[in-house]
Amino acid sequence: MNPSYKGKVRDIYDLGDKLILSSSDRISAFDVVFPQLVPDKGKVLNRISVSWFEFFKDVPNHILETDVKYFPIPFQNHPDLEGRSVLVKKCKRIDYECVVRGYISGSGWKEYKNDGTLAGIKLPSGFKESQKLPEPVFTPAVKNDQGHDENISEKEMENRIGKELFNILKEKSISIFLRASEVVDKAGIILCDTKFEFGILDGQVILIDELLTPDSSRYWSTDTYSVGISPPSLDKQILRNYLETTSWNKMPPAPNLPAELIQELREKYQKIEDLILSCTSQKSK
């Protein structure tokens, strides 16, 4: 069964007014897909995302069904989809990534070091790497399915889509981020940053894509967090770190990865799943 669209790590089946989103075991870094699979990665990401959508069920979203046996024929009980897929409403995608940062890290830290800004917003001097921001900062990006997303300022996004829609996206993104941060904190996890995606269906803004997975978010453990360094992430950062030690030029084809690294990645994904599901199993407030 061939998907209608095959992304770096996700397969999409177009059913007309609905879509099936299937999370594969493929892994990518620097926008390049690697030849090996990480066993069960797709199922882990799917379970995490579904658990968050259920937790935030008060926020309108695109989910229709999470159990393959209730998918339309001929997709019912299909082994390639089992446990890693969701049936969703097709909507008009808003082509922006709504990134929220609670800490100054990654590309945000690089920008601040160079320019004293974060997404074009001037920040006070004296911030250190991985320091918590006084309040979450909204740093949008234009989606680019063929390559790197383009970071833009709040003002530029507002000018492109209008003040009303911009305010809705910003407010929803920061609200979900704050609620999720409070929830995972109870399990000793820090939500450093994440990205949300939204669509429009019947005139309503709804939450789409994946939600608060370790592929769309940066999670840290409170046990290893420290200001002034880049703390170990509970995600595929170990893959990026490994690649930085090689001579690979970050262009296709991707190199083969050591078996022990694949196993370590698998364990990382399973660990963050256990931690997150222990939080999201409680009823959304």
From Swiss-Prot:
Pathway the protein acts in: Purine metabolism; IMP biosynthesis via de novo pathway; 5-amino-1-(5-phospho-D-ribosyl)imidazole-4-carboxamide from 5-amino-1-(5-phospho-D-ribosyl)imidazole-4-carboxylate: step 1/2
UniProt keyword list: ATP-binding, Ligase, Nucleotide-binding, Purine biosynthesis
InterPro entries attached to this UniProt entry: SAICAR_synt/ADE2_N (IPR028923), SAICAR_synth (IPR001636), SAICAR_synthetase_CS (IPR018236)
UniProt keyword Nucleotide-binding present: yes
EC supergroup of this enzyme: ligase
Domain of life: Bacteria
EC number: 6.3.2.6
Molecular-function annotations in GO: ATP binding; phosphoribosylaminoimidazolesuccinocarboxamide synthase activity
Catalytic activity: 5-amino-1-(5-phospho-D-ribosyl)imidazole-4-carboxylate + L-aspartate + ATP = (2S)-2-[5-amino-1-(5-phospho-beta-D-ribosyl)imidazole-4-carboxamido]succinate + ADP + phosphate + 2 H(+)
Gene3D superfamilies: ATP-grasp fold, B domain, Phosphorylase Kinase, domain 1
One Gene Ontology biological process: 'de novo' IMP biosynthetic process
GO cellular component: cytoplasm
Family membership: Belongs to the SAICAR synthetase family.
Protein name: Phosphoribosylaminoimidazole-succinocarboxamide synthase
Provenance organism: Leptospira interrogans serogroup Icterohaemorrhagiae serovar copenhageni (strain Fiocruz L1-130)
